[in-house]
C-alpha cells in the first residue's frame, strides 16, 4: 500500500504532533497566495509522544480536539507528519523507466533500500527526474513508514472525528513551506530543532539532497539547566529561551549551552560535509532554523560562528496574508519557527 507523501489537491489543516506540543495551522489559498486562518498549540504531558510514537493516544487526541474547538476549526480533513526511527527517507539512483515500471520496480525491490520488512511499511516515492541527454539514470526519493506507527496516528485522529488525507514527513513539510517563501535557486540547510529530535534537510536546485533525523533536541538543554539549579521545568525553559534573566547563573548556563549546542552543531556539520562532498561545485548559501529549539538564546550567533555560514530564523508566514484583527503580525513572526512544520503540512493539498 502507498501513502500520499507526494500528492496534490485541496488544502488540509496541518497538525504537527511533537513530543512537547501539538501545533495546528489552517490556511486558505487565494489568487494572491495563502492566508493564515488559524494557528495554535497546546503542550502535551511529558511522555505522551516519544520519538514519533504515540504512547498516550487518548491524551493526544483530547488535546487536538480541544485545540480545534478553541480555534473554532470546522474542517475535518487534516494532515500530519512523521519523523524519527519509524520513517526512512532515501535517495536511490535508478535507470530511467516509465512510471508504471518504476512503481513496479520500487515495490518489488524496496527491501534492498530500506532496513524494514516490506510487509511492515507503507511505501511512496517520487522520481526527481535528474536524468539528462548524457545520463539515462535518475534519482528517486523513496519513503518508507512503519505501518504500526502510522496506523496509530490514523486511528487516534479518526477517534476524534478527523480524517487524515495527508501523511507527510517532517523534512518534506519544512521544504514545502520554505519553497513557498524563498526562490528555488538557493542551496540551503533547513534545520528544525524540536524538543526531542532535530531534522536536517538540505535543498539544492529545488530538491532535497540530504535528509536526516537525529535524536537530539531542545529538551536536553532545558533538563540540563533544570538539574543544574534544581528548579522547575518552566523556569529552566525560560532561562533557555532568555525570557527569564540568568543573573548570577549566567556563566553556568553558558557552559551548559556550549556542551549541548556543540553536539547539535556537530550533527549539522556532518550533514553539511556530506552535502559538500557530493556537491563540491554548489556551496551552501545559508542555514535556516525552525522549531521551538531554534529560539534558544544565542543559538543563531553560535551556529554562525561555528559554521561560517549565514544563519536565520525561519518565519513561514512572512509572505502570507492574515486578518490583522484576529492574528497579530508580530505574533505570527514570534511563533513562526515552531509553526514551520504545521504550516508546511497545511500548504499541502489533500488527495481526497
Language-model segment annotations:
Residues 72, 152, 194-205, 333-352:
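Extended, charge-rich low-complexity interaction segments
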Residues 64-77, 160, 231, 269-286:
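Phosphate/pyrophosphate-binding loops at sites that engage ATP/ADP/AMP, CoA/4′-phosphopantetheine
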Residues 227, 238-286, 293:
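Adenine-nucleotide phosphate-binding core of ATP-dependent small-molecule kinases
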Residues 1-109, 151-153, 159, 163:
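Non-catalytic, solvent-exposed interaction/assembly segments
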Residues 11-15, 187-191, 288:
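Conserved beta-strand elements of the Class I
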Residues 81-180, 286, 316-323, 338-341, ...:
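Active-site neighborhood for divalent-cation/phosphate handling
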Residues 19, 25-36, 80, 135-235:
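Small-residue (GG/TT-enriched) beta-loop-alpha framework at ligand/catalytic clefts
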Residues 260, 282-318:
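Glycine-rich phosphate-binding loops at beta-strand->alpha-helix junctions
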Amino acid at each position: 500500500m502507498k501513502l500520499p507523501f507526494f500528492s496534490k489537491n485541496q488544502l488540509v489543516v496541518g497538525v504537527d504532533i511533537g513530543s512537547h506540543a501539538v501545533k495546528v495551522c489552517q490556511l486558505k489559498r487565494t489568487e494572491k497566495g495563502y492566508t493564515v486562518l488559524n494557528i495554535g498549540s497546546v503542550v502535551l504531558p511529558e511522555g505522551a509522544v516519544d520519538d514519533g510514537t504515540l504512547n498516550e493516544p487518548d491524551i493526544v487526541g483530547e488535546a487536538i480536539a480541544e485545540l480545534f474547538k478553541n480555534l473554532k476549526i470546522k474542517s475535518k480533513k487534516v494532515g500530519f507528519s512523521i519523523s524519527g526511527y519509524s520513517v526512512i527517507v532515501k535517495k536511490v539512483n535508478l535507470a530511467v523507466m516509465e512510471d508504471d515500471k518504476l512503481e513496479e520496480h520500487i515495490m518489488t525491490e524496496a527491501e534492498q533500500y530500506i532496513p524494514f520488512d516490506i510487509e511492515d511499511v507503507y511505501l511512496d516515492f517520487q522520481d526527481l527526474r535528474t536524468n539528462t541527454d548524457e545520463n539515462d539514470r535518475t534519482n528517486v526519493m523513496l519513503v518508507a513508514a512503519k505501518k504500526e506507527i502510522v496506523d496509530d496516528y490514523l486511528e487516534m485522529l479518526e477517534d476524534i472525528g478527523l480524517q487524515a488525507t495527508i501523511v507527510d514527513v517532517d523534512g518534506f513539510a519544512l521544504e514545502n513551506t520554505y519553497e513557498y517563501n524563498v526562490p528555488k535557486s538557493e542551496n540551503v540547510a533547513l534545520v528544525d530543532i524540536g524538543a526531542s529530535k532535530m531534522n536536517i534537510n538540505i535543498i539544492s536546485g529545488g530538491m532535497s539532497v540530504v535528509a536526516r533525523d537525529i535524536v537530539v533536541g531542545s529538551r536536553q538543554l532545558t533538563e540540563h539547566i533544570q538539574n543544574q539549579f534544581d528548579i522547575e521545568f518552566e523556569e529552566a525553559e525560560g532561562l533557555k529561551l532568555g525570557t527569564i534573566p540568568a543573573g548570577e547563573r549566567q556563566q553556568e548556563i553558558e557552559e551548559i549551552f556550549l556542551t549541548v549546542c556543540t553536539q547539535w552543531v556537530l550533527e549539522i556539520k556532518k550533514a553539511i560535509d556530506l552535502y559538500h562532498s557530493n556537491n563540491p561545485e554548489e556551496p551552501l548559501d545559508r542555514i535556516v532554523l525552525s522549531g521551538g529549539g531554534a529560539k534558544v538564546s544565542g543559538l543563531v550567533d553560535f551556529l554562525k560562528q561555528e559554521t561560517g555560514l549565514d544563519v536565520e530564523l525561519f518565519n513561514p508566514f512572512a509572505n502570507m496574508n492574515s486578518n490583522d484583527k484576529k492574528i497579530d503580525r508580530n505574533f505570527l513572526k514570534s511563533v513562526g519557527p515552531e509553526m514551520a512544520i504545521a504550516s508546511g503540512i497545511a500548504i499541502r493539498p489533500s488527495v481526497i
